[in-house]
């Protein structure tokens, strides 16, 4: 932000974890960080509903800075990167992943039943588990490639 503002442009940060919380079952944030990242050419939204990059898989956390600074997208918009893969769908213990490819502008429910995912994890809240199980992240081939490249570097 300092760089942007030092060049005379405005910068408004939007944290990744801000949510509207007006509807306890909406599971939505105040800003669509994943959509913005796709339009910036940084990656794609997978069948799991996770934002995925070729370099880091879904092991990313997004925040956004809105600015009036003229910027060029990092790359071409990737409309889908999962193809026919259904590993996450088949591994999801909640059955929350439909197996459909993400289509820009389509409702999230066409690819992921967020309420079903959340309900599955609520069954484990008494043992101190988090809000998501992460199995879709664990089995994603994009994350596997990252683990293999990390192991090769060691």
Model-derived features: positions:
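Catalytic cores of enzyme domains
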Residues: 1-154
């Amino acid at each position: 932000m300092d760089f942007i503002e030092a060049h005379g442009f405005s910068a408004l940060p939007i944290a990744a974890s801000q949510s509207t919380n007006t509807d306890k079952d909406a599971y939505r944030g105040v800003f669509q960080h994943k959509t913005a990242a796709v339009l910036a050419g940084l990656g794609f939204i997978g069948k799991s509903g996770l934002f995925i990059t070729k370099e880091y898989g879904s092991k990313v956390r997004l925040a956004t800075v809105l600015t009036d600074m003229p910027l060029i997208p990092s790359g071409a918009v990737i409309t889908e990167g999962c193809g026919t893969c259904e590993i996450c769908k088949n591994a999801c213990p909640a059955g929350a992943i439909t197996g459909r490819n993400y289509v820009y502008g389509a409702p999230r429910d066409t690819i992921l039943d967020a309420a079903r995912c959340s309900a599955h994890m609520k069954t484990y809240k008494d043992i101190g588990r988090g809000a998501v199980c992460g199995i879709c992240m664990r089995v994603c081939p994009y994350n596997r490639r990252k683990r293999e490249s990390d192991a090769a570097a060691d």
